[in-house]
Amino acid sequence: LYSSSGKKYLDFVQGIAVNSLGHSNDYLIRAINKQSKKVWHVSNAFVIPEQEKLAKKLTKNTFADFVMFQNSGTEATEAAIKVARRYFYSKGKPQKNRILCVKNSFHGRTLAAIFASGSKKMTEGFGPKVQGFDHFEFGNHKSLKKSITNKTAAIMIETIMGEGGIKVVPNWCLKELRKICNKKKILLILDEVQCGIGRSGDFFAFEKSKVKPDIVPIAKGIGGGFPIGAVLMNKKVASGMTAGTHGSTF
């Protein structure tokens, strides 16, 4: 890339982990050019063949049985929260609505997402606190276990933390998280919005652990430079998302 003064840069930022195939990729150019001569947009109220194709690829190659598409990463994490809460509501347990997150994590810039992040820097000046979130210290298993209550619906954690410092959740820790969630009968949400889509060497950063989460929000690299997010989920938790419980224009 070149600045306005002609200075040359190697782009390792990649639009903050978005341009997974770089700039002006031939494959993306051909795909965009082909689609631009067809239907542009009809909303998710209709069947979209290319969207179905992507959903099938995602479910075929991941743990997921269902996919809900969004516009961005923060919408994907907000939708993940809705999926978790709605699941327990559909099971007659509406009191199980709290999401347990890591202090100083990052799950997006919308209102619920910033309070999920548990960071004063993120929430300062944005009015009344959004309820429904509890927090524990990264790597502190006693803090984690102590924070789980009969109102906890899910644990949501970045597989590799971004804003809070590049902290990798070890594979053994992911396995323990899965065991804890199974024992407490709560859901495991692994936020792969920034660390996913090949950035760790695998499609998802959690793959080497062999852990199967219940819900995974993704975005950034999946669009190759275009705004797209998605929530991946298993059949069990998807059962709560009936017609009309969620939607997205794009």
Language model segments and positions:
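Conserved N-terminal phosphate-binding loop of PLP-dependent enzymes in the Aspartate aminotransferase
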Residues: 1-250
